[in-house]
């Protein structure tokens, strides 16, 4: 429901592609372009990206055609809570560990985690990308940048041989 009291309808999905080496792991995106076909491909791709890390993680991807752009905090929170009313029974630390993606930042992940906690009465590591107040990482905003630097340093070492 928007702030004017109008009911809004959006489609939401979670594609769990592969959990052969660990729980499903992949982002959730909120963007008008999201559809099942795109998420199936992204979940497939996420399986391979995760396997290359050598961490025990499978691949998944999710999202909705809801776009948080231009929405109030209350509109975003109401949507996320409605989304979690369906998603919560399919995620968990040993099952599926979603993260943020396009249109899903710390605020949205925090709303998801809060609703998950309310529904399950558990304070577990079910979501990555949440704020520090919910047990998130201190350097989450910089993590991708650090990863790029480490990758570049390894590339330079490899090419200098």
Over which residues does each language-model region extend?
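Adenosine-phosphate binding glycine-rich loop
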Residues: 155
């Amino acid at each position: 429901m928007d702030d004017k009291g109008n009911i809004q309808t959006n489609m939401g999905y979670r594609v769990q592609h592969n959990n052969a080496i660990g729980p499903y792991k992949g982002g959730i995106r909120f963007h008008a372009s999201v559809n099942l076909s795109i998420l199936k491909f992204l979940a497939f791709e996420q399986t391979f990206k995760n396997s290359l890390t050598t961490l025990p993680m499978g691949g998944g991807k999710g999202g909705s055609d809801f776009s948080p752009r231009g929405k109030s905090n209350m509109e975003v929170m109401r949507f996320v809570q409605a989304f979690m009313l369906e998603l919560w029974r399919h995620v968990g630390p040993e099952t599926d560990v979603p993260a943020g993606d396009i249109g899903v930042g710390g605020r949205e992940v925090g709303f998801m985690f809060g609703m998950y906690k309310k529904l399950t009465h558990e304070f577990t590591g079910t979501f990555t990308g949440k704020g520090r107040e919910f047990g998130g990482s201190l350097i989450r905003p910089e993590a991708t940048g650090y990863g790029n630097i480490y990758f570049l340093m390894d590339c330079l070492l490899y090419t200098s041989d």
